[in-house]
């Protein structure tokens, strides 16, 4: 029996279709999300492809499996002292003031998840829309009926055929949104188990309320085996957290800029069916897909095997995103080096540990690699840090930080080779009143 229209009333048999996808090895969370999308697609309210509830549920499962300790009063006091020291040091180096928003100095993994989940959804919804639109376009542009395996019968009327194509396209939209929500939720859950603070991911996620907030449980895990005084570890991580919080709180455009480049990437997504067919045939011939493995399709999708070829506009978007992420990390590394390298005996060991973890075991990198095929290389981050150091030498600390007023004042990859020429090519404003 096929899996398209029901035998009695000609309505689409989506339960059978979802069962077929399950038998092909598609992840259970992905199928559940697609089913939920179908059940709600008649709702009068606009529905996001990626829902906060779906992301949160998957991330919570991963957090719970690892354990989430409550934050005690002693944790708050110790980390509050570390942040005070960090902010005192940073006051003398960077232009951006610390936030005056009331906040605690420490939070749990679950607190961080709840505070950032809506930003994650906003950030990657445009990507889901782009991929879903591309899939829908493939179905709607198909001439004639879908294969009989999808229709359940060769005798459907033209109206039924068109209805099935439209409904199948809706199913694929839900499927794609759920797939991305599953991957994103898993990545966020892994992040929650590893980041040391609310801003450790080095992108603004606190909805305009960027404050320094550390995660004691993960700090203890981060410092295991280092053999370094815990107080130095806390101050070092507080410096990173406080510097990032100041950068994000005083440059609100950064959040929209990152979202805009992801949106630009998503809008450029298109699907070349012939190319995907070719990739599948080559993958099976090379043994990359085992047709006897029921999880083959899930493995192929999650590994990015059928990633569409990027357009020039998408390549530009990824270049901008990579540079923004590298410049943020590079600036943080640079400014904390300026204030702490001579004050903390273990500073060099601590910053090297940070860089090594980013390069070899970064859940944030994995999220971007899985969803956008983007990896920010450690070399690019080192180059970005060196860029900020040279800008300070040429323009001073204030001139360095004024570069963050607008994306127009940030370099592209080629600009890193000649910092002086880049600075001469842009006009950095003297008035920062619009930032503060």
Feature-to-residue mapping (PLM):
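Short, glycine/acidic-rich hinge or "gate" loops at secondary-structure transitions
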Residues: 99-105, 252-261, 346-349
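A short mid-domain helix/strand-loop element embedded in enzyme catalytic domains
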Residues: 205-220, 293-311
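Post-HExxH zinc-binding segment in Zn-dependent metallohydrolases
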Residues: 178-199, 248-301, 316-343
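N-terminal low-structure segments adjacent to metalloprotease catalytic domains
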Residues: 1-134, 382, 386-389, 394-436
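Pan-zinc metallopeptidase signature
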Residues: 303-436
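Short pre-active-site segment immediately N-terminal to the catalytic Zn-binding motif
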Residues: 219-239
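Auxiliary, metal-adjacent structural segments of Zn-dependent hydrolase domains
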Residues: 79-217
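Active-site recognition of the HExxH zinc-binding catalytic motif
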Residues: 232-250, 388
């Amino acid at each position: 029996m096929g899996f398209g229209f029901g035998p009695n009333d000609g309505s689409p048999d989506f339960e059978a279709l979802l069962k077929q996808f399950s038998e092909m090895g598609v992840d259970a969370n992905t199928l559940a999300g697609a089913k939920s999308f179908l059940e709600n697609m008649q709702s009068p309210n606009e529905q996001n492809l990626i829902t906060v509830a779906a992301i949160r549920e998957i991330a919570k499962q991963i957090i719970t499996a690892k354990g989430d300790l409550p934050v005690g009063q002693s944790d708050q006091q110790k980390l509050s002292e570390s942040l005070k020291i960090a902010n005192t040091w940073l006051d003398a180096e960077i232009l951006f003031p610390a936030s005056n928003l009331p906040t605690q100095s420490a939070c749990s993994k679950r607190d961080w998840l709840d505070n950032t989940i809506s930003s994650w959804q906003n950030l990657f919804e445009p990507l889901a829309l782009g991929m879903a639109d591309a899939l829908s376009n493939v179905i709607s542009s198909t001439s004639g009926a879908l294969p009989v395996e999808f229709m359940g019968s060769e005798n459907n009327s033209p109206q039924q055929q068109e209805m099935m194509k439209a409904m199948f396209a809706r199913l694929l939209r839900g499927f794609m949104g759920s797939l991305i929500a599953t991957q994103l939720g898993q990545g966020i859950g892994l992040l929650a188990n590893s980041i040391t603070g609310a801003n450790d991911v080095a992108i603004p996620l606190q909805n305009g309320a960027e404050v320094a907030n550390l995660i004691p449980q993960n700090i203890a895990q981060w410092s295991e085996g280092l053999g370094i005084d815990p107080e130095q570890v806390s101050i070092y991580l507080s410096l990173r957290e406080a510097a990032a919080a100041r950068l994000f709180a005083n440059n609100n455009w950064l959040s929209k800029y990152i979202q805009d480049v992801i949106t630009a990437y998503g809008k450029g997504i298109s699907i070349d069916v012939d190319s995907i067919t070719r990739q599948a045939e080559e993958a099976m011939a090379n043994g990359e897909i085992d047709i006897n493995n029921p999880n083959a399709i899930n493995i192929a999708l999650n590994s990015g095997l059928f990633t569409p070829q990027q357009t020039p506009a998408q390549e530009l978007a990824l270049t901008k995103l990579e540079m923004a992420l590298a410049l943020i990390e590079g600036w943080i590394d640079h400014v904390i080096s300026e204030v702490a390298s001579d004050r903390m005996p273990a500073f060099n060991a601590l910053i090297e540990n940070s860089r090594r973890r980013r390069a070899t075991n970064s859940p944030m990198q994995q999220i971007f690699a899985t969803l956008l095929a983007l990896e920010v290389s450690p070399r690019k981050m080192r180059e970005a840090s060196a860029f900020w150091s040279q800008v300070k030498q040429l323009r001073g600390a204030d001139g360095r930080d004024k570069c963050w007023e607008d994306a127009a004042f940030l370099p592209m990859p080629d600009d890193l080779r000649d910092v002086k020429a880049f600075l001469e090519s842009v006009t950095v404003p003297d008035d920062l009143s619009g930032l503060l």
